[in-house]
Amino acid sequence: MKIKHWDRWLASLKDDDYLKNIEAIKLYLAVMSIYEPDLLDEYMIDDDFHPMISRLKNVTLDVTSARFKELYITESKMNYARDELDGAMIISKTLTKSDIVGNVALPKAQVMSVLTRMNGVTDEGLDNGFEVQVHDIMEDDLYTVTLKRIDDMKYYFGTGWSTMKHSLDLVEGDVQKLYWDQFENKFIVLNFQHKTMGIMIPV
């Protein structure tokens, strides 16, 4: 459901419908607070919307993890697919045989670009191995891999790469694209249609 239509949907709910959809309502508010905080503020002061919020505050809800996953992950996919991604924060690599057999070598210039917006990264940390998270939002799988630098200016994924490549069923010739989200402090696997600098990039 489009966020801009959500207030009308909520206002149209009758008592029975409201109770049936209470989980969706609370979770959608939580997602909006993350991705559309300004829009949520507008809804909070809307005369038609405010009574529903007042009622919502009095509801205690045990939200199942499955329901949260369904709504939260769907919204995440929409966000990364809809918004234009900064190309300077994308690492793209066509995988070679050696990448599949062992560790994956990463493009130097792209890694150095991403490093400018990584928090807590030091030269010593890169030399010893710096753990980063990689999120496949399509499957809601989260991987931890070690980003490491050798010979001063060569970068690769070490520990954790084996698990990630097998889980994603990667083979030689596949193009692996990762987007660094500096606000979430993790990489997003770009295995869905997305936009970069106004251009729609197919999977």
Curated annotation (Swiss-Prot):
Domain of life: Eukaryota
Molecular function GO terms recorded: DNA binding
Compartment list: Nucleus
A GO cellular component entry from the record: nucleus
Keyword annotations from UniProtKB, A to Z: DNA-binding, Nucleus, Transcription, Transcription regulation
Main subcellular location of this protein, as a coarse class: nucleus
Protein name (record): Putative B3 domain-containing protein At1g50220
